[in-house]
Curated annotation (Swiss-Prot):
Phylogenetic placement of the source organism: Bacteria, Pseudomonadati, Pseudomonadota, Gammaproteobacteria, Enterobacterales
Keyword set, alphabetical order: Arginine metabolism, Hydrolase
Xref: SUPFAM superfamilies: Pentein
UniProt-listed Enzyme Commission number(s): 3.5.3.23
Active site residues according to the UniProt entry: E174, H248, C365
Encoding gene (name): astB
Source organism of the structure: Salmonella arizonae (strain ATCC BAA-731 / CDC346-86 / RSK2980)
Any one GO molecular function term: N-succinylarginine dihydrolase activity
Pathway: Amino-acid degradation; L-arginine degradation via AST pathway; L-glutamate and succinate from L-arginine: step 2/5
Name of protein: N-succinylarginine dihydrolase
Taxonomy, superkingdom: Bacteria
Length: 447
């Protein structure tokens, strides 16, 4: 059956700021306390979406979350109306205000793990929401992510959506950022590669930075998504790579159809994994980048592997890269050599995503890949599909509501909270989402 990969990109939220909240993500730490530009950030993301949609790649959007998230502050013991709570937390515990104001939901590669209908025992598309429990600011995302995905994938006869795993360390799940699918045509059954950083009883784990994904979580997600057990492989990420800032597998590897593009130091027992994939995937091709051409640290700094690998109609592939790759002499030299060689990757497209990149999120972080048949794609909420009209509407929406300068101190501004809620009210109508946010369901306690 004919199927296509649809990229659902996250819209950057109004409170996009640099707070260094993500230990293990070196870009996040390095840019802490810099001044951000939320308007530029959302426009950079929209330009990438529109350019790829215009090039014939199906593209959709996933909305941002409500931030600052006042219910989390109430749960932490701050009381009063919303404005009083903002004032209290800004004076007493400003770090908590930054945590509940993170725009991290824009990195929707962490929203869920997806199983196409061709791989599922029941023939439905499955999505399991990620619990993201390694970081407090990201652990807040799952309930609203689930609500948003339910408004996008509404047809329960075609889509099965699963709530996040329990919020315990043993079941740490970071979503599609630690998941690859390999195979032939999108509509045919593929092999799903789940990548984890640690497992109970295995002493092989990173020493410096946390391994966010557990094997136990990956196995549970595969069960929830009803992936055919004959089509699943579990592999450990190289702990030494995690300690160099590879906090998700999509910072060191990307796959598309029969191609796995990765660093030679991406996986534990990598040679064995590659040989196993050769026996499981027809026409499998591993493009392993040697350390003497691109080091792990340079791969992390440029997000070479946090790229999108997209199939074109002629069977060749396009590599979508951040500007940082072109700016790095060694990485750009390697990439030009790569596209000149005999392999499916024949073209590159570079995007300026510096606002997201400074927080540690490249092109691949910003998108959730969902393989859909033509019938399944028609069952998706049509209002979220990118086209000329939506691009124009979202740019006008951003111009109306987004600030072009934001610091951590600005998060305490009650006007920012009101601006955000008004913006999301307008957006839910624009994208036909209904009352999906908590403030819309309970009413804002603004005194």
């Amino acid at each position: 059956m004919t199927a296509h990969e649809v990229n659902f990109d996250g819209l950057v939220g109004l409170t996009h700021h640099y707070a260094g909240l993500s230990f293990g993500n070196e870009a996040s730490t390095r840019h802490r306390f810099q001044v951000s530009n939320p308007l530029l950030a959302v426009k950079q993301g929209l330009l990438k979406m529109k350019a790829l949609a215009d090039a014939g790649f199906p593209q959709a959007v996933i909305p941002p979350h409500e931030r600052p998230f006042i219910p989390a502050l109430r749960q932490l013991g701050f009381s009063g109306n919303d404005e009083q709570i903002l004032d209290k937390v800004a004076r007493q515990a400003p770090r908590w205000l930054s945590r509940v104001s993170s725009a991290s939901p824009m990195w929707v590669a962490n929203a869920a793990t997806v199983c196409p209908s061709a791989d599922a025992l029941d023939g439905k598309v499955h999505l399991t929401v990620a619990n993201l429990n390694n970081k407090f600011h990201r652990s807040l995302e799952a309930p609203v992510t689930e609500a948003l995905l339910r408004t996008i994938f509404r047809d329960e006869s075609r889509f099965s959506l699963h709530s996040a795993l329990p919020q315990v360390a043993l079941l740490g799940d970071e979503g599609a950022a630690n998941h690859n699918r390999l195979g032939g045509e999108y509509g045919l059954a593929g092999v799903q590669l789940f990548v984890y950083g640690r497992e109970e009883g295995n002493e092989k784990r990173p020493a410096r930075y946390p391994a966010r994904q557990t094997r136990e979580a990956s196995e549970a997600v595969a069960r929830l998504n009803q992936v055919n057990p004959q089509q699943v492989i579990f592999a450990q990420q190289n702990p030494e790579a995690i300690d160099q800032g590879v906090f998700h597998n999509d910072v060191i590897a990307v796959s598309n159809r029969q191609v796995l593009f990765c660093h030679e130091a991406a996986f534990a027992r990598q040679e064995r994994l590659i040989n196993h994939l050769r026996t499981r995937v027809d026409g499998f091709m591993a493009i392993e980048v040697p350390a003497d051409e691109v080091s792990v640290s340079d791969a992390v700094a440029t997000y070479l592997f946090n790229s999108q690998l997209l199939s074109r109609d002629d069977g060749s592939m396009l590599l979508v890269l951040p500007q940082e790759c072109q700016d790095h002499v060694g990485v750009w030299r390697y990439l030009n050599k790569l596209v000149a060689e005999d392999n499916p990757i024949s073209a590159m497209q570079v995007f300026d995503l510096r606002e997201s990149m400074a927080n540690g999120g490249g092109p691949a972080c910003l998108r959730l890949r969902v393989v859909l048949t033509e019938e399944e794609q028609r069952a998706v909420n049509p209002a979220v599909m990118m086209n000329d009209a939506l691009f124009t509407a979202l740019n006008a929406w951003a111009e109306r509501f987004y600030r072009d300068r934001l610091t951590a101190a600005d998060l305490a501004d009650p006007l920012l909270l009101r601006e955000g809620r008004e913006a999301l009210d307008v957006l839910t109508r624009l994208l036909d989402l209904g009352s999906v946010y908590p403030f819309q369901q309970t009413g804002a306690a603004d005194g």
